[in-house]
Amino acid sequence: MKCGDTVTLNELLEQYNIKEVNKLNLGWSKDEKLILIDKNNNKYMLRISDKSLYDKRYRQYKLLKEVSKFNINCPKPMDFGELDDKLYMLLTYLEGNRAEEEIIKYSNTEQYNLGLEAGKILKIIHSYDKESDTLTWWEKYEPKSIRKINTYLDSELKHNDYEFLINYYKENIHLMKNRPQILTHGDFHLGNMLIHENHIVVIDFDKMNFADPYDEFKPYCWNVLRSEYFETGLINGYFDNKIPDDFFKLLKFYTIESLISHLPWAMTFGEEEVKTAYMIYDKVIEWYDNFKLEIPTWYKGVL
């Protein structure tokens, strides 16, 4: 069978000599995830998606094939096609412990060094230059920003200083003009990493797209809540200790954007996610000293 062929699950399992199938229940994706083990005890990840996602998943498959040529620890795509009435993508399965749980077992120096490694991996991913989007970042970003503001203002729940958030966002949205675009992981944080033999493994490229490289740092809160040293190392590793003058100003803007979009999103998932959204807001207030700081308090500088 060739890549792109339609197969049944049994045919696929037979083709790869699979002897064991286990379901994996992790992450927010609606994809079904199966861990496959073949007769030689090689492991694979089988992602099963709705057929309506064909264009997105096929593009993801092709981009992953390009990224996998880099010397980084990430899943390698093996096969892609239609599986019964759905889509499948077969990837190598990488061993490791969940980084968000494992990171706190390391010393501050070790956490920082793992962050350095993650930052260097991210820089390598961003070095892909064989393809780009036809639309500019601003052309994609501006319509989304209008929807985010309207959704937030129409939301039943808001932050106490929501007017400040909206005004700051509107006053600084010009920063999004003329931003470069590169290939991004799309959700680069500890929740999508493993640690194996004291090294970072990057997984779950489900949100891979072309975006402003600084947009990649937007989910930093999930790192900082586990390790300020890891996030500091990630930034320093990415920039080789030479932080651009505009980085923290843009990171603050993206932080405000995240606060505006997080709460309405959380409301669709229930009370616990709403509590998390408010907790993140309180932390951001603390890290930015009520938004008086440009550089958040968790950043440790070059160590």
Residue ranges and their predicted role:
Residues 4-15, 116, 127-186, 236, ...:
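An alpha-helical support segment within catalytic cores of ATP-dependent transferases
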Residues 15-24:
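Conserved N-terminal boundary motif of the eukaryotic protein kinase catalytic domain
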Residues 23-136:
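ATP-binding pocket architecture of kinase catalytic cores
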Residues 32-37, 167-217:
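Active-site acidic catalytic loop and adjacent metal/ATP-binding pocket
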Residues 45-48, 78, 183-186, 202-204, ...:
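Short beta-strand segments
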Residues 64, 107-108, 201, 218-220:
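Glycine-rich, phosphate-binding/catalytic loops in enzymes
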Residues 68-71, 81, 97-98, 122-130, ...:
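A general structural signal marking secondary-structure boundaries and capping sites
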Residues 214-244, 255-272, 279-284:
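Active-site activation/catalytic loop segments of kinase-like enzymes and analogous catalytic loops
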